[in-house]
Structures are given as structure tokens and as C-alpha cells.
Curated annotation (Swiss-Prot):
Covalent cross-link Pyrroloquinoline quinone (Glu-Tyr) as placed by the record, residue numbers: 16-20
Descriptive protein name: Coenzyme PQQ synthesis protein A
Organism of provenance: Gluconobacter oxydans (strain 621H) (Gluconobacter suboxydans)
Keywords from the named record: PQQ biosynthesis
Any single Pfam family the record assigns to this protein: PqqA
Lineage of origin: Bacteria, Pseudomonadati, Pseudomonadota, Alphaproteobacteria, Acetobacterales
Record family assignment: Belongs to the PqqA family.
Function: Required for coenzyme pyrroloquinoline quinone (PQQ) biosynthesis. PQQ is probably formed by cross-linking a specific glutamate to a specific tyrosine residue and excising these residues from the peptide.
Alphabetized InterPro entries for the sequence: PQQ_synth_PqqA
Pathways involved: Cofactor biosynthesis; pyrroloquinoline quinone biosynthesis
Coiled-coil stretches: none
HAMAP family: PQQ_syn_PqqA
Swiss-Prot/TrEMBL GO biological process terms: pyrroloquinoline quinone biosynthetic process
Keyword flag Ribosomal protein: no
């Protein structure tokens, strides 16, 4: 799972995606 996103938006975007994916898996 590789996301080609700028470092500036990588942290908030990554956190949002992570929480979404975690919620989907659970």
C-alpha cells in the first residue's frame, strides 16, 4: 500500500485513510 502524496498532506491524509481502513477491516 503506497500513497504518492506530498509530505505536507501525507500526515493528515494518511491518518484519515488509516482510520477509515481500520474501521473497514474491523
Amino acid at each position: 500500500m503506497a500513497w504518492n502524496t506530498p509530505k505536507v498532506t501525507e500526515i493528515p491524509l494518511g491518518a484519515e485513510i488509516n482510520s477509515y481502513v481500520c474501521g473497514e477491516k474491523k
